[in-house]
Amino acid sequence: YVDKDGKYQGYDVYFAEQLAKDLGVEPEYTSVDPAARVDVLTSNKVDLVLANFTVTDERKEKVDFAKPYMKVALGVVSPESAQITDVSQLDGKTLIIAKGTTAETFFEKNAPNVKLQKYDQYADAYNALLDGRGDAFSTDNTEVLAWAKSNKGFKVGITHLGDDDTIAPAVQKGNTELLNFVNDEIVKLGKD
C-alpha cells in the first residue's frame, strides 16, 4: 500500500527490495491498478507483479505465478464509531472496494444488497473511507489489518471472510528464468 507520505509499504515492498538486492539492481516501482495487474505483465510493461496478487484459475491462464508466500481471506475495516462486525450490517450500506479484486468478486456474488463503491487504486479507496464516502472498506485481511493499525479511529470488525486464498508473485507467461529465481528467493526467505 502507499502510506500518507506517498511511499510504498508492506510485505510486497520488503520482498521486492530483497529480490532487487539479490539481483544486484535497483527496483523500479510502477503503480498498478488492481484490475490491471495481468495486463501490465502481458503487455511487457513490468517484469514482475508483487501487488498482493491473489492466485486464481482465471489469472493462471494468462500469467505464471511463483510459489505462494501468504494466505489471506477478506477483511472489512470501518470507523470505530460505526463498526461493521457482520456482513449483514452492510445491507443497504456503501462498501468501498478496489476494482478487479477478490473483494469485488465476493461481494457481487454474495451480497446483492450492498452498494459497492469501486475505485481503481487502493489509495483512492482508503481515502474514500477516511473521507466518509462509504461505510466500510474490504480487501485482503492482511491489508486492512495493517492499515487500521496506522489509522486511528478505524477498526477491522470482520477479520476473516470468504475462502482462504494464496498470494503469490506473478511473471509473464513462459518467463521461467525469472519465475525460478523468484521461487528460489521465496524458499530462501522462508528459511530466514
What are the residue ranges of the model-derived segments?
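Ligand-binding cleft/hinge of the Venus flytrap
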Residues: V2-D5, A16-V25, A103-D120, A148-K149
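Hydrophobic residues within well-ordered alpha-helices
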Residues: L19, L41-T42, L90, L129-L130, ...
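Extracytoplasmic small-molecule ligand-binding "clamshell" domains
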Residues: Y1-N52
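Periplasmic-binding protein-like
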Residues: M70-S78, A103, N141, L145-D192
